[in-house]
């Protein structure tokens, strides 16, 4: 995904997006279109908006969304230009649906109606007992049957799974009626043509074909009865006994594979149409399909969806991550130039957008079932999910998909050597999958060739058909005798994990006995077959543990360097390493024909890599225009990502390092030719993804120029945590003196808590020393910090004894919240009484404005707020509630401000006081910081230096869900914004180390970094 949109005036001016309310929004859903940039698409996905389809158009990306009226209004208020999606007759999607229903359906039938889909499945089984078996594999939330049909000769007598088997399923998303029809017609194609068509007859006699045309029967029926555009199942998320927007689980995010891997591929929010559910496989519909998959372990699966047109395959959890079985997927799916389903775009699912907990990923990873998701067409321009109720159009869509569906059945006996009506075949060995799919070029998971080697022994690898058995490495050095070596299967590394290596596997061996200058020819043999060869040159063979990856792009154009015959800043790195007793090798990208270092040939030989970028703003070749990048930028990311996956350690540094990923610059994936960002659909442009930055480098948000002063210089930096604690440095002086830009980052663990997402653990290890910084403690070293999280009600609470003469509470607060939506306030009640109210700040920092969250229904999240606010019949809000009144602050406080609260109303009594911070459904500022609390009686006075003096994080009141995090006592190191972010294996600087002012300071920073990375 792209940049998280924070409301932080001092750090970033990014656009902010907000998703819709949970709970009782009963407005009809409708479809809209908007043209946005690539970064905005990522924001929409992250915020859980229901994105139906995307298309590359002039000026950006056209996005189709399904929105409630409330969601539409909120998104429009954030500056996204929405237009109702209409067909050629000017009808909206809901109007089209209403017209279909009013006229009576010709094609479509519901689940429950007499003669509906359920009855039809029973009738098919009843009429064809010799080759059709019906099985109820589970029941839905509301008790409807989930019906599967097994089609094979002697179906009722033959044990399940006795023949090569294939699974066709549909309607996991309720509104996708065309998927139901295509699956139903495919079922009829086999049933109705058995003993009539020789191809069908042979398949039914020799294969086992399973069908579940409706895997979400509750949702499917609901689309007929209530809401045509409903997507999820009918789980009652808030337990109010009603079905409304905010209910339901996205069943295609509920499977027990990478479930809750992150908050991008699925959502934790009820209201999101990608809500993943309370736990993996929590839904009975999911359990039914999972149990079937585990029991039968199909050879193949096809799960029909709409709308695209797309033909997606594994994986969904991480971008540009093909499986080891990719030769099968490519052979059967085809390519952009020649797809297996005419007009469809085949490819890896995550390259559309990240998903996790999906049916296909579960099937492949857990049950060794290779799976596809055809995203069927919409039927007409502007029809969206309401495919026309037109027999000819529906049948045409089925016929278009039939050849691929038949290929899947035909290929079941030997998946490793599939049948394709395109004539595609697979080979025993692959060194380079880009030969069959240009989109796989230079990906370390699919392109294993390299030109130079930096070590001996030199690992080499090949993708080999598993049935070949033992694979032998063959190589020649300088044309000498052929030498042989064993190979072993690669385990996938630390992060990639399961390679999906059911029928193919990556085999590795080692070439030994080379010297610098040698030319080595490599190939592999096994099972009577041999791979193509490739040749590399041995260049470097040292015992150095560190590689300096010089990626200055001095032969590029952004900027144009004065010195273009070699690196400008390399000496600063080599010298700083030498000062710490470390010798290093160098890989100069420009000098290597602008080629990224190979994982195997170069990076694998080192324990740590220093990747620096000098003055490079964006890696861009001559002839490329603004808004675009060289494919080299993506190649470098993929190479370093693969290196980290195998246990490597990295320091990334540069004044613009990561800007291209953060801003989503486009590049040509296939040919590295210039591409036009305003016409991406015609020239192969793809965006640089920031997933590497977020999930490998621990930097969830890139804050552009956040460490730069008004006069263009950089603030000093102070170390706050491992490995830079107690270290400080400045810029300029006797250095490269080139630091005129900077970045800070929000640590990924500040957004995805390490307690839940330990794989992304990260922290701010150094910060810019901004004078009067609004997010450092007001005094001393400690303060209370709210942390960052949506849908939370956080309280810092203490009981105070108020004397007869009254008392006063004062404290300093610095807050940055989503303006008008998230609020900071002081609430109080007499101990033992329900007289709750909020108290105004006598210094004028609070107001009675209820903001935008109250009329948008945030009481559904936090019903306790009814004590202070009232939602009126006209959808306005009053700042009084059942027991008290509303006084709060929102937005950015502009730094530390002092609040003063009068407690005289509680004279002679005990009062429980809470400093509270409440957030809505989505979008976070940087949170709330509290320091230097003073109570006039002395009771509860604290600056948090030695403790909290009785102030505790008490959690939310009744009615709100549990907080994902709470107020904590911490140093500035507990706030996740930093000039440097550190993970277990990486350090990421928002500046170039070459610009640190003095050699001694550079040496100290380098020493700390290397001490950590080489530990």
Language-model segments: residues:
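Extracellular glycan-recognition surfaces and repeat-rich motifs
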Residues: 490, 726-794, 819, 837-897, ...
């Amino acid at each position: 995904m792209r940049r998280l949109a924070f409301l932080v005036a001092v750090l970033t001016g990014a656009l902010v997006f907000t998703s819709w309310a949970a709970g009782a929004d009963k407005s009809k859903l409708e479809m809209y279109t908007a043209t946005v940039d690539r970064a905005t698409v990522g924001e929409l996905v992250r915020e859980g908006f229901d994105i139906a389809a995307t298309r590359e158009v002039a000026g950006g990306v056209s996005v189709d969304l399904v929105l409630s009226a409330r969601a539409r209004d909120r998104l429009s208020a954030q500056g996204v230009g929405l237009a109702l999606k209409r067909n050629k007759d000017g009808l909206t999607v809901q109007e089209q649906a209403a017209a279909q229903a009013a006229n009576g359906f010709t094609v479509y039938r519901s689940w429950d109606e007499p003669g509906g889909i359920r009855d039809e499945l029973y009738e098919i089984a009843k009429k064809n007992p010799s080759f059709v078996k019906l099985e109820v594999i589970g029941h839905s939330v509301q008790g409807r049957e989930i019906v599967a049909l097994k089609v094979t000769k002697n179906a009722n007598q033959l044990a399940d799974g006795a023949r090569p088997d294939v699974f066709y399923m549909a309607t996991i998303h309720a509104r996708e009626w065309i998927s139901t029809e295509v699956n139903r017609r495919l079922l009829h194609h086999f049933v109705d043509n058995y003993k009539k068509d020789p191809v069908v007859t042979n398949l039914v006699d020799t294969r086992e074909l399973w069908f579940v045309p409706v895997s979400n029967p509750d949702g499917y029926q609901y689309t007929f009865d209530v809401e045509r555009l409903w997507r999820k199942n009918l789980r009652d998320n808030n337990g109010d006994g009603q079905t409304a927007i905010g209910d339901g689980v996205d069943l295609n995010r509920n499977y027990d594979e990478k479930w809750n891997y992150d908050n991008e591929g699925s959502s934790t929010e009820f209201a999101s149409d990608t809500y993943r559910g309370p736990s993996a496989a929590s839904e009975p519909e999911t359990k039914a399909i999972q149990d079937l998959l585990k029991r039968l372990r199909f050879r193949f699966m096809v799960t029909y969806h709409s709308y695209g047109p797309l033909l997606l395959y594994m994986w969904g959890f991480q971008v540009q991550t093909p499986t080891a079985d990719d030769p099968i997927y490519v052979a059967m799916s085809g390519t952009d130039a020649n797809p297996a389903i005419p007009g469809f775009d085949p490819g890896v699912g995550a390259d559309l957008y990240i998903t996790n907990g999906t049916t296909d990923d579960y099937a492949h990873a857990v049950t060794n079932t290779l799976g596809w998701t055809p995203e069927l067409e919409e039927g007409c321009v502007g029809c969206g999910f309401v495919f026309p109720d037109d027999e000819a159009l529906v049948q045409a869509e089925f016929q278009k998909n039939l050849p691929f569906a038949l290929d899947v059945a035909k290929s079941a006996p030997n998946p490793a050597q599939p049948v394709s009506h395109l004539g595609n075949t697979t080979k025993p060995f692959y060194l380079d999958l880009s030969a069959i799919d240009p989109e796989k070029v230079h990906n370390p998971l699919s392109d294993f060739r390299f030109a130079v080697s930096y070590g001996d022994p030199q690992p080499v690898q090949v993708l080999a058909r598993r049935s070949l058995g033992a694979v032998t490495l063959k190589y020649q050095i300088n044309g000498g005798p052929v030498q042989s070596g064993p190979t072993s299967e690669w385990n996938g590394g630390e992060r990639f994990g399961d390679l999906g290596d059911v029928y193919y596997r990556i085999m590795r061996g080692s070439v030994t006995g080379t010297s610098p200058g040698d030319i080595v020819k490599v190939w592999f043999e096994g099972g009577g077959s041999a791979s193509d060869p490739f040749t590399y040159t041995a260049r470097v063979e040292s015992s150095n543990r560190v590689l300096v990856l010089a990626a200055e792009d001095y032969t590029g154009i952004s900027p144009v360097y004065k010195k273009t015959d070699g690196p400008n800043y390399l000496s600063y790195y080599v010298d700083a390493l030498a000062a710490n007793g470390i010798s290093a090798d160098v890989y100069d990208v420009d000098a290597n024909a602008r080629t990224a270092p190979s994982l195997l040939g170069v990076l694998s030989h080192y324990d740590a890599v220093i990747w620096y970028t000098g003055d490079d703003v964006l890696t861009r070749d001559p002839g490329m225009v603004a808004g675009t990048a060289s494919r080299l930028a993506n190649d470098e990311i993929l190479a370093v990502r693969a290196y980290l996956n195998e246990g490597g350690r990295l320091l990334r540094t540069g004044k613009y390092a990561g800007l291209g990923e953060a801003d989503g610059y486009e590049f040509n994936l296939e040919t590295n030719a210039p591409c036009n960002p305003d016409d991406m659909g015609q020239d192969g442009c793809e965006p640089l993804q920031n997933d590497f930055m977020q999930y490998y480098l621990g930097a969830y948000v890139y804050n552009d120029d956040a460490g730069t002063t008004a006069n263009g210089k950089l603030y000093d930096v102070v170390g706050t945590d491992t490995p830079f604690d107690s270290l400080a440095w400045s810029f300029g002086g006797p250095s490269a003196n080139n630091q005129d830009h900077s970045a800070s980052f929000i640590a990924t663990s500040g957004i995805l808590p390490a307690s839940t997402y330990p794989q992304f653990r990260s922290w701010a290890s150094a910060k810019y020393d901004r004078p009067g910084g609004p997010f450092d403690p007001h005094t001393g070293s400690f303060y209370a910090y709210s942390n960052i999280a949506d849908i939370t009600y956080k309280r810092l609470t203490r009981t105070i004894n108020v004397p007869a003469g009254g008392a006063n509470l004062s404290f300093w607060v610095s807050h940055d919240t989503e303006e008008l939506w998230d609020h900071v306030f002081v609430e109080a009640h007499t101990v033992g009484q329900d007289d709750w109210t909020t108290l105004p700040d006598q210094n004028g920092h609070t107001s009675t404005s209820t903001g935008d969250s109250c009329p948008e229904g945030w009481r559904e999240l936090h019903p306790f707020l009814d004590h202070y606010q009232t939602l009126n019949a006209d959808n306005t809000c009053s700042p009084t509630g059942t027991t008290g009144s509303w006084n709060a602050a929102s937005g950015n406080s502009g730094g530390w401000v002092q609040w003063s609260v009068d407690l005289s109303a509680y004279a002679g009594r005990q009062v429980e006081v809470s400093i509270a911070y409440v957030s809505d459904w989505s979008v976070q500022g940087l949170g709330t910081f509290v320091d230097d609390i003073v109570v006039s009686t002395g009771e509860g006075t604290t600056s948090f230096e030695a403790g909290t003096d009785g102030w505790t994080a008490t959690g939310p009141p009744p009615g709100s869900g549990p907080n994902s995090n709470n107020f904590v006592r911490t140093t500035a190191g507990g706030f996740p914004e930093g000039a440097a972010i550190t993970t277990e294996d990486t350090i990421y600087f928002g500046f170039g180390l070459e610009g640190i002012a003095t050699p001694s300071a550079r040496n100290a920073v380098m020493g700390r970094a290397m001490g950590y990375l080489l530990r």
